[in-house]
A protein has these predicted regions:
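Well-ordered beta-strand positions
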Residues: 123, 145, 201-204
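Walker A/P-loop phosphate-binding motif and the immediately C-terminal alpha-helix
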Residues: 2-42, 46
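P-loop/Walker-type NTP enzyme "switch/lid" segment
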Residues: 36-119
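NTP-binding/hydrolysis catalytic cores, primarily Walker-type P-loop NTPases
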Residues: 218-243
Length: 243
């Protein structure tokens, strides 16, 4: 069974980008089979990662979660792959889909789904929703490692001040979260040290990368990054989470 890594964080903290780049770092560093699950139904990410793919070349994991029984065969059918990399795939929702497209999957079915994905990959990275849906709740509960991602701004601080008390339930395992700060903007003044002081024990900081910003604009997030500082930091984080 593969290792499950859950990425949860505040809105606009760069969770999806971080999840994709972390999966890439794991793939490159450990020569692993890696699956990235994109849980968001409010802004489906498959069309963001694969903007030039025809709709008929993409598949939605919503079709799997809507089935009575979840099998390896059905999950494999819905994996979207990168033609440049073997054993590196994505599961998510398609452009135009939303929370009403498919029947809501219960937590038991989400657990079955995640267990199947763990039989298909060495590492499964789950990009959880900021307000956890059933799939995200189960992923956090099942995860071998949980990353809580914040951005160094007042909005992120306000989000966690509001949501962490709600997540006091032991199933969210807040005391086990690995806290990271992701610098997603290049502002004149970034209150990074103040953010670290506010959030407490910060395990890592992801530096701002102009190259990542350009990839985001161009719909090229699955492409390699040459930014040495960014890559070095992701390698360190990948090693901490996977080894």
């Amino acid at each position: 069974m593969g290792k499950l890594v859950a990425i949860w964080g505040s809105p606009e903290s760069g969770k999806t980008t971080f999840a994709v780049k972390l999966a890439t770092a794991v793939y490159n560093q450990f020569q692993s089979t890696v699956l990235t699950i994109l849980a968001d139904q409010t802004a489906p990410a498959l069309s963001v990662l694969f903007p030039n793919r025809k709709k008929e070349d993409l598949s939605s994991m919503g079709m799997v979660l809507a089935k009575t029984e979840i099998t390896q065969e059905e999950v494999i059918k819905c994996i979207v792959t990168d033609p440049k990399r073997a054993n590196f795939g994505f599961l998510g929702y398609m452009d135009g889909e939303n929370v009403h497209t498919y029947a809501k999957a219960g937590e038991r079915k989400c657990r079955d789904f995640l267990n199947v994905t763990k039989t298909l990959a060495n590492v499964v990275v789950v990009d959880c929703t900021s307000l956890p849906d059933n799939l995200s709740k189960v992923a956090i509960n099942m995860a071998d490692e949980i990353v809580r991602l914040a951005s160094p701004d007042l909005k992120s601080m306000a989000f966690f001040n509001s949501q962490l008390p709600i997540m006091a339930d032991t199933s969210f395992r807040c005391e086990e979260h690995i806290l990271g700060i992701n610098v997603v903007r290049q502002d004149v003044y970034i209150p990074l040290e103040e953010a670290k002081e506010h959030f407490g024990k910060v395990s890592f900081t992801v530096p701002y990368s102009q190259e990542i910003r350009i990839q985001t604009i161009n719909g090229a997030l699955i492409e390699p990054v040459k930014d040495a500082k960014f890559n070095d930091r992701l390698r360190i984080v990948a090693q901490k989470l996977v080894e």
